[in-house]
Amino acid sequence: MMNPRRLPPLPSSTSSASAADDMDPRVWRRLPQPLVDRVLACLPTPSFLRLRAACRRFYHLLFSSPFLHSHLLLSPHLPFFAFVVPAAGHLLLLDPTATASWSRLPLPLPPVAGGPAAFSPAAASAGLLAFLSDASGHKTLLLANPITRLLAALPISPTPRLSPTVGLAAGPTSIIAVVAGDDLVSPFAVKNISADTFVADAASVPPSGFWAPSSLLPRLSSLDPGAGMAFASGRFYCMSSSPFAVLVFDVAENVWSKVQPPMRRFLRSPALVELGGGREGAARVALVSAVEKSRLSVPRSVRLWTLRGGGGGGGGGAWTEVARMPPEVHAQFAAAEGGRGFECAAHGDYVVLAPRGPVAQAPTSALVFDSRRDEWRWAPPCPYVVVAHHGGAGAAGFRVFAYEPRLATPAIGLLDATAPVALHGMHDG
């Protein structure tokens, strides 16, 4: 577990134009410290990180368990998106709100001398990013908090695999990770046979977690490791191709089932995402995909469906189309995408679609869909230059994840037997 005391800033590429009134020191100097701490705990993470340099006491709040616990409960939800370029050494963070802006944040991964990155981005949840080891065999899954630079590894996965699909669902004191498909049946052959599930919970024994018995994937499954998984209501969802199908994993039952997607013969570059959720309510599974059909009555478009009632043992569920990209926006998007596909993620009410470039190294443009306002808009160009890395993991292209910057990710403490969970943001008192 690494926890350097030097925390990275979150510099914004755009400066706020709104001028706030200066704080009157005659008022703030006389406020009780508990009240000041309460106000600071209500600040968004980027705002507090910029303010921590104001005085030594504010900085030391970063290492106060009671303050981190309050900040975890009181700070507003931030629907950021993390663009991860393998071997680049940093994240590109997109704030998709009306005043969209970009930030850059270094990655806390250990350096690998004399070669490409040994870990590739795989999943994200609750302020944590997951990175999977590139080497074939028994996999190592690293969880990292880029804000605090905490880093911890899950126990080695029990089944040897080549390039599996990974899902992650983290809570304040729990972690569920799924590593599925690409079983190494021999040194030269892989099959999509099984999935391994890691479960850790502060209330269970042992709290440091364990790998549950392997579960069997549905027959004829074909998983794409770059597609990832969505999580909602205790179930993981991932895409299977040739033909397209949605695979559903019930964590409690340790059983997989299959749901048919809408218009499956005409989908291109489909992606499953978690729409909504956060502190406002339960997340819904949504399917975002380009639709291409030769008949003129069904024009080319990008559509978004939500699933209701899916995931039961019978594989039922109904899809409802909730959004369709307007023709003029689709024309711009299709020109930017050029048939190469796109990366997609959802966070709260926002969906981000990033066309893959010809070199597939870094995002050159990103389209934001605000589902609450039913509004499509382009994010400003990313001002940061990403140095291309050829070969190895760097050739895989960027990934985009729903990411919320958090000071406290207490669940990561479950993976370090020498560090109690309270040291990472939870406090009983």
From Swiss-Prot:
Transmembrane regions listed in the UniProt entry: 72-92, 112-132
Listed result of changing residue 15 to P: In PBN6; bigger peduncle diameter due to larger vascular bundles, increased number of primary rachis branches (PRBs) and of the number of grains per panicle, thus leading to increased grain yield
Phenotypic consequence of gene deletion: Reduced number of primary rachis branches (PRBs) and of the number of grains per panicle, thus leading to reduced grain yield.
SMART domains according to UniProt: FBOX
Expression (tissue specificity): Expressed in seedlings, roots, leaves, shoot apical meristem (SAM), developing panicles, and, at lower levels, in developing seeds.
Kelch repeat windows: 229-277, 284-339, 350-397
Annotated spans, Disordered: 1-21
Effect the entry attributes to changing residue 295 to C: In PBN6; bigger peduncle diameter due to larger vascular bundles, increased number of primary rachis branches (PRBs) and of the number of grains per panicle, thus leading to increased grain yield
Biased composition (Pro residues): 1-11
InterPro entries on file: F-box-like_dom_sf, F-box_dom, Gal_Oxase/kelch_b-propeller, SCF_F-box_component
Keyword Nucleotidyltransferase in record: no
Record pathway: Protein modification; protein ubiquitination
Keyword Nuclease listed: no
Keywords from the named record: Activator, Developmental protein, Differentiation, Flowering, Kelch repeat, Membrane, Repeat, Transmembrane, Transmembrane helix, Ubl conjugation pathway
Highest taxon in the source lineage: Eukaryota
Membrane topology value: Multi-pass membrane protein
Pfam families in UniProt: F-box
Domain notes from UniProt: The F-box is necessary for the interaction with ASK proteins.
Function according to Swiss-Prot or TrEMBL: Component of SCF(ASK-cullin-F-box) E3 ubiquitin ligase complexes, which may mediate the ubiquitination and subsequent proteasomal degradation of target proteins. Together with FL/APO2, involved in the temporal regulation of meristem identity during both vegetative and reproductive developments in an APO2-dependent manner. Promotes spikelet formation by suppressing the precocious conversion of inflorescence meristems to spikelet meristems, probably via a positive regulation of class-C floral homeotic genes, but not of class-B genes, and through the control of cell proliferation in meristems.
Further remarks about this protein from its record: Ozone has various impact on different cultivars; O.sativa subsp. japonica cv. Sasanishiki exhibits ozone-induced leaf injury, but no grain yield loss, and, by contrast, O.sativa subsp. indica cv. Habataki has grain yield loss with minimal leaf injury upon ozone treatment. Plants harboring the PBN6 quantitative trait locus (QTL) (e.g. HI1 allele in O.sativa subsp. indica cv. Habataki) exhibit bigger peduncle diameter due to larger vascular bundles and an increased number of primary rachis branches (PRBs) and of the number of grains per panicle, thus leading to increased grain yield.
Subunit structure: Part of a putative SCF (ASK/Cullin/F-box) ubiquitin ligase complex. Interacts with FL/APO2.
Name the UniProt record assigns to this protein: Protein ABERRANT PANICLE ORGANIZATION 1
Provenance organism: Oryza sativa subsp. indica (Rice)
